[in-house]
Amino acid sequence: VAGAAEGFDNDEGEAFTVNYDIRLALKTSFTGKDMLTSVLRAGNFGPSIWDEGLTFVETAMSSGGSVKIGRLFYTFPVGENLTVTAGPVVRTDDAGMYAGYATFYPSDLLLDFFTYGGAWATNNLASTGAGLGGVYKFGDSGFSVSGNYVAWDGSSTGIGRDETGSTSSWQLFYEGEVFDGNFLAQAGYAYAQNVGLTIGTNKAGAAAGDNRHGYSLAAAWAPADAGLIPSISGGWSMSDPDDSDEDIHGWYVGLEWSDVFVEGNSFGTAIGQAPKVEDDYNKMWEIFYKFAVTDNITVTPTYFIIDEYSGDLSSDYVQGAYVKTTFTF
């Protein structure tokens, strides 16, 4: 990722930076139906604007010049309809932990806020830990449910204790065909314990406290064939802190067109409101065009605007651009 932004109070915040994130996924199956997944990861995004706040990009990772274990979990079936995942380094949205994202936006993960599929309050992606989860599919109905528990510091404070930083997420998910297109929908609930807010304005972070209930609704539709009609994705989440009377809300709507000008390329844009309290203000917008240079190389120029970056009506207006290049092997 190479880019810069303006609107910050310090020169470092507006510096042009070049950052990398590299991942090596090792997947082993013992029965043909199970999967042991381990991911080695390294990156140099921090400290930079791409590694913090509302300008955080989905690929941002800082490893301090070393290679770290990004994932280590085992997924296996139980009967015909249930899939279970367990491991010491797992996240709430990993395979067998989460039924699915009700979104078709974006095809290339960019600003982190827009990658949650509207479910930022029920799918905490800030960290990994020791976890257990399962996904149950109701036959061919298109419906599935999932539930999981992740203890961020399970190796030190333990699992299931009052001091443990943890999240527990539950989801009802649907996938089917509607109006000659593909339709996704989800409703989610989560409880976070001793965990700060993953993303949001300054006031939202202060109001969130450490313990809170989260709720989310999201839906998305995509045409069966590429054309003038884009995919449409939208979602809303609310967080209800235990120690505050202020609820936290956020929403987004994203549009994406496939095979724009050239097959394999896509164009997309999204607008939304980062998690905020009632007397707060924030608006976010991004636009991108993804070039498929080859089957294994994509280049995605992106431009974004964040109105009220801090969300405290301080008139901080941030805009920026970057180019994300992805190589897959």
Tell me the role of every PLM-derived stretch.
Residues 1-87, 112-114, 123-155, 162-166, ...:
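Beta-barrel outer-membrane channel/assembly domains of diderm bacteria
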Residues 94, 106-117:
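Hinge-like oligomerization/junction regions that interrupt long coiled-coil arms in large cytoskeletal
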Residues 264-266:
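Glycine-centered loop/turn motifs
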Residues 48-52, 96-104, 197-199:
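Outer-membrane beta-barrel and related beta-rich outer-membrane complex signature
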Residues 92-97, 154-157:
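Short, well-ordered, mixed-charge alpha-helical segments that flank or form enzyme active sites
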Residues 119, 205-206:
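Acidic/glycine-enriched edge-of-secondary-structure segments
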Residues 53-56, 101-107, 202-204, 318:
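Flexible, surface-exposed loop regions and adjacent strand-edge segments
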